Each structure stands twice: as C-alpha cells, then as structure tokens.
UniProtKB/Swiss-Prot annotation:
A Pfam family of this chain: Citrate_synt
Name of the top EC class for this enzyme: transferase
PANTHER family assigned to the protein according to its UniProt record, in alphabetical order: CITRATE SYNTHASE, CITRATE SYNTHASE, PEROXISOMAL
Activity modulation comment: Allosterically inhibited by NADH.
Keywords in alphabetical order: Allosteric enzyme, Transferase, Tricarboxylic acid cycle
Name the UniProt record assigns to this protein: Citrate synthase
Catalyzed reactions per annotation: oxaloacetate + acetyl-CoA + H2O = citrate + CoA + H(+)
Length: 385
C-alpha cells in the first residue's frame, strides 16, 4: 500500500497540551519557567525548592510558604524498606535509571488507593520529590557498594541529597552546583519522557506509574543518556592536542554523531548549556583531571560550532552537564548522570501530569497510517509454500 497520508514523524511540532509551566524560543535561545528566564533565576541565587514550588503552584513562594513546602518534601525522605530492598536486590552493575524505575514501580504497586484530586495532588507531588531524592541516594550508594542511607532535612534539597549520597558534608561549591543543575533540568516542555508520562496518566493511571513511564523514556541515549555519551566522547579523545584529528577522523570523515550537539527545538546555543559551561569551568579549575576534560570539551566545541553552527546545531544542555556532575564527585558509570537528570525532572513531570489531568484530561490515543498489504486470504499452514 502506498504511503498516501502524511504522518508527523517523532510527533515533531505537534502540540499535545496547553501549559503555563515552560516556554522555549528555540530561535533566540530563550527558556522561561512560568515567565521567569532561567538566567535570572540562577543569577538571583534561587533555591531549587522555590522552583519546585513555582511548578506545582504557579507562583514563587513566600518565606512561610517555602518553609511549609520544604516540610512536605522532607516527609518523602523516609521511603519504605521495601523500596530500598527493590533497589538493593538488583545487581550493582545495573543501569541507575532502571533502578529508579524499579523503586518508583514499587511505590506504584503499594499505592493502591491513589486518586487524582485537586486538593491533594500537589502534596503527593511534593512528597514524591522528596522520595525521589531518597531513591536516587540509595541507587547511587548501592552502585558504589555503600550501605543504605536516607536524606536528612538541611538548608536545601541539594544539600540533603549530596550529604546522604556521599556520606559526608558537601561543600558550598558542590551544593551550589547541584542546586543549579537541579533547576536547569527541572523541565523542558514536553520532550520524550514527559510525553511518555502524559500518555500513562491520560489513562488516569497513578502519579508513580506516570513517573515510571517517563523514566523508561529518559533512559535512552537520545534523551537523558546524552550527558554520559558526551563525557565518553571526551574520554575517547584523551588530550586537547588530539581534538582536531579526532574531530576530522570521526565526525567529518567518519560521519559519527557529535554527542551533546544539536536539539530538536533550539537552533542556537542552548541557554542551559551556557550556564553549565560556566560552572564546569569554575569547578574543574580545582581538579586537574576534570579540567583536562573541560579543555577537551571547549576545544571540541569550537570545531563543532565552526562545522555545524550555520546549520543551527550548537551545544545542548548535556554537553557540559556531565563535567559538572564529575566535578561534584559523581563517577561516569551505570548511567548515574541520567539518574541525576531524573532527580531534577521529576518536578516537571509531575507538574505536567497535574496540569493535564486537572485541566485538559483526555485519553491520548493517536492513530497510525496502514501501509501494509491489502486484504489477503488466510491459508492453512499445511497448504503454505
């Protein structure tokens, strides 16, 4: 059958919902959360919890509202033993995001009475943000062969997470960098993971199942896995002096993909990448081995922009974020960087789920254009040739 009808491959430029959460101008490189530019948010020294609140409630919190909100998030730090067991029964070599999926799926299995409710949805989401911190801490500690640990309340979400993950008091520089990373990865409209989660909750499945679906999509190398792929690329080059040769051999002549470059929406420099680059430069300057990776990245960036900038292909947020995670102290293994992405994005996922279910609820059920054989007659197996 000929392909006579148009389809939207990859759902590109298909609008599936209205949103007050995030707006992107891909041509100008602008990203705003609820009307606030990410540059202003970061420059103002905002805490991640303020941005979490913005996504769930639509406004920045007062001091009193923020204190109350933090208490709700911190309730989620105490995850049940069966969730920790779901993580620790897996091989330590397992993918970190798959471990998160197992833990969140365990939450979904236990929440048999979940009902979408405007009066409680945001409290459920806030507590789940806390649970995601505890889950990610224990995923990391299991991979690193460390005993189970739960985050404890502190001055910030970022600090509680790092203290529990590393088993020591995080430095101010580490906390500030993690806080910024959490904010920058909070949301990005409806990429593959958010869309996957929306499909799940459009059936009125529970919040946790929506997160599990989103994690499954995020796990792929074309979405959340790009940060680790970019670092692996820098490691392959090994030395700044080898960048030009590697670029010509692998990208220009080898036709390989330059990881961390290009974005479906942005046709200019990703504003998040600019911020991550600045943090990577600052943090790596105190760690020679990491700074060498940063030097490789910046030199490769120059070649990439010269070759592809005229086509609207520039560094995206994943190009430098891995260097930031590495500088904080997270190793390149088990897809850990993508799990850190998920720790940030759980806020945006849930905000989109709530917005959709409360205001625009409709089962997402697209169609496919059939291009297979026309009508055929069934032939019994003994008569087939």
């Amino acid at each position: 059958m000929p392909e006579t009808e148009e389809i939207s491959k990859g759902l590109e430029d298909v609008n599936i919902k209205w949103t007050r959460l995030t707006t992107i101008d891909g041509n100008k490189g602008i990203l705003r959360y609820g009307g606030y530019s990410v540059e202003d948010i970061i420059a103002s020294g905002a805490q991640d919890e303020e941005i979490q609140y913005l996504f769930l409630y639509g406004n920045l919190p007062t001091e009193q509202e923020l204190r109350k909100y933090k208490e709700t998030v911190q309730k989620g730090y105490k995850i049940p033993d069966f969730v920790i067991n779901a993580i620790r029964q897996l091989p330590r070599e397992s993918d970190a995001v798959a471990m998160q999926m197992a833990a969140v799926a365990a939450m979904a299995a236990s929440e048999t009475k979940f009902k979408w409710n405007k009066d409680t949805d945001r409290d459920v989401a806030a507590e789940m943000i806390g649970r995601m911190s505890a889950i990610t801490v224990n995923v990391y500690r299991h991979i690193m062969n460390m005993p189970a640990e739960l985050p404890k309340p502190s001055d910030s979400y970022a600090e509680s997470f790092l203290n529990a993950a590393f088993g020591r008091k995080a430095t101010k520089e580490e906390i500030d960098a993690m806080n910024t990373a959490l904010i920058l990865y909070t949301d990005h409209e409806v990429p593959a993971s958010t869309t996957a989660g929306l499909v799940a909750v459009s059936t009125l499945s529970d919040m946790y199942s929506g997160i599990t679906a989103a994690l499954a999509a995020l796990k792929g190398p074309l979405h959340g896995g790009a940060a680790e792929a970019a670092i692996a690329q820098f490691d392959e080059i090994k030395d700044p002096a080898m960048v030009e040769k590697w670029f010509n051999d692998n990208i220009i002549n080898g036709k390989k993909r330059l990881m961390g470059f290009g974005h479906r929406v942005y046709k200019t420099y990703d504003p998040r990448a600019k911020i991550f680059k600045g943090i990577a430069e600052k943090l790596s300057s105190k760690k020679p081995e990491v700074h060498k990776v940063y030097e490789i990245a910046t030199k490769l960036e120059d070649f990439g922009i010269k070759a592809f900038g005229s086509k609207g292909i520039y560094p995206n947020t994943d190009y430098f974020s891995g260097i930031v995670y590495m500088s904080i102290g997270f190793p390149l293994r088990n897809n850990i960087y993508t799990a850190l992405f998920a720790l940030s994005r759980v806020t945006g996922w849930q905000a989109h789920f709530i917005e959709y279910v409360e205001e625009q609820q409709r089962l997402i059920r697209p169609r496919a254009v059939y291009v297979g054989p026309a009508e055929r007659k069934y032939v019994p197996i003994a008569e087939r040739k």
